[in-house]
Regions:
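Short, cysteine-centered beta-strand-loop-beta hairpins and adjacent loop/turn segments enriched
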Residues: 128-138
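Hydrophobic pocket/interface hotspot
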Residues: 46-49, 61-62, 69, 91, ...
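A solvent-exposed, acidic/Ser-Thr-rich amphipathic alpha-helical stretch
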Residues: 67-112
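Short beta-strand edge/turn micro-motifs at domain boundaries
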Residues: 140-166
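Short, surface-exposed coil-to-beta transition loops
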Residues: 107-108, 136-142
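Bacterial N-terminal signal peptides
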Residues: 9-18
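Short, low-complexity N-terminal intrinsically disordered segments enriched in polar/charged residues
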Residues: 4-5, 18-63, 169-171
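A short hydrophobic beta-strand element
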Residues: 118-126
């Protein structure tokens, strides 16, 4: 690659007007389009999970989770006692089942999706009222998903575990 080709590719990438697209710059654009398509597909899988959770659609949730799923709750949180959860059954029993039994009106509200390759980070909030304590939960979260072949293979939760523990622990 000549210095001229590199310079033209750099100017083209910077948005310089009137600079012709070179053959050297086209593969980079093609790779960017493929990455964007992959990001969008993986984000769609994660969005489907949140929609299914909100609808109480366990069959769809189960279909989005890989059989060899590894799910990790935030350390020191009320559901981290069984970390790492292996497979959808462990997640349904150890997390979803317990939350359903312990909270009234529990909701997971994703606000921002940040896809990058096979990972999708999601920023949002949890809300609900603990049945035993009557305390309301309103905690931020970051969820980091790894998606492979249209299935969620890994999940890592980050949240305000101190708030969770305050809400679930009787005075």
């Amino acid at each position: 690659m000549t210095v001229r080709t590199v310079l033209i590719a750099a100017l083209t990438a910077a948005g310089a007007v009137g600079v012709p697209m070179t053959a050297a710059a086209e593969p980079a654009r093609s790779a960017e389009r493929a990455d964007a398509a992959s990001d969008a597909a993986n984000q769609a899988v994660v969005e489907s999970l949140y929609s299914a959770f909100a609808a109480g659609d366990g069959a769809t949730i189960n279909g989005l989770l890989a059989a060899d799923l590894v799910w990790i709750e935030a350390e020191n949180g009320p559901y981290a006692d069984r970390n790492p959860y292996s497979g959808p059954g462990a997640v349904f029993e150890g997390i979803f089942g317990r939350i359903g039994a312990e909270f009234e009106g529990f909701a997971v509200a994703p606000a921002t999706y940040l896809p990058s390759g096979d990972r999708v980070a999601v920023l949002g909030r949890y809300s609900g009222t603990n049945r035993a304590t009557g305390e309301a939960l309103d905690a931020q979260f970051v969820h980091v998903f790894t998606v492979t072949g249209g299935k969620i293979v890994h999940f890592q939760q980050y949240t305000d575990t101190a708030q969770w523990m305050d809400v679930v622990t009787p005075d």
